[in-house]
Amino acid sequence: YRVGGKNAPLANDTKIAEFRRLNEAAIRNAERAEVLFDRQKQFIGNASHEMQTPLAVCRNRLEMLVGDGSALSEEQLGEIMKVQRTLDYLVRLNRSLLLLSKIENGQFPETEQVDFNALVGRTAEDMSEIYAGRGMRLSLREEGRLAARMNSSLGASLVTNLLKNAYVHGDAGGEVTVTVSGDRLSVCNSGAGGALDADHIFERFYQGAKKEGSTGLGLSIVDAVCRLYGLRTEYAYINRCHCFTVHFPK
């Protein structure tokens, strides 16, 4: 049983009254959990949506203050920049929460055939300079053609968040290898510290080690996209490398 997984009720044709009552109690508890889960999703979606405007207003006003820097001391400008960095983090966090809410509420009905070889190539090229800034080497291995029918924006989010995760949590000066084959997409990054908790790695806000610039939601977005389209996620720590793999139906 998985909350939000649209689980079908288990058949129970027992004639034993105690078992029947136990089954009825379990069904009631499951239904109550589903209602609470739906309310939580709705609250997060509504809250994230309502926060967009005030966050944008705060951001614009801070930019106006910085733009008129002549009226501020160097110390004041420094404090404003700190607030701006915190606000930028909140904006990214809010966008991620809103995206998660939309995915879970099925707000991406449009689908098309997504060419992951081309998508990974474009994304890797776009991020190559960012990787270079940390001295990281990004390599792409194509072992086959990979295509799947899904919303193109969500396909892009899937790839982007896997590559961002490798960048944020990978070793400076380390390597990131992206492998595309006929039925899987994997991203491996070198990283010390040992294996992460495979049972919780895709949960919201789980972080093996807090890293600046990370919202803790990237892998949750990956997992949400995969669950939406029936894909399987897998994590493994192999030869001092963290490997995240998405398995596609053959």
Feature map (PLM): residue ranges:
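A residue-level detector for a conserved hydrophobic packing site
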Residues: 155-159
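Membrane-proximal HAMP signal-relay module
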Residues: 1-47, 51, 56-72, 81, ...
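Bergerat-fold ATP-binding/catalytic subdomain of histidine kinases
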Residues: 103, 200-211
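Conserved catalytic submotifs in the C-terminal HATPase_c
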Residues: 112, 132, 137-149
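Short helix-loop "hinge" at the ATP-lid/N-box region of the Bergerat-fold HATPase_c
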Residues: 165-167
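Short beta-strand/loop element within the Bergerat-fold HATPase_c
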Residues: 173-184
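Short flexible loop/turn segments at helix-to-beta-strand junctions
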Residues: 10, 75, 105-118, 149
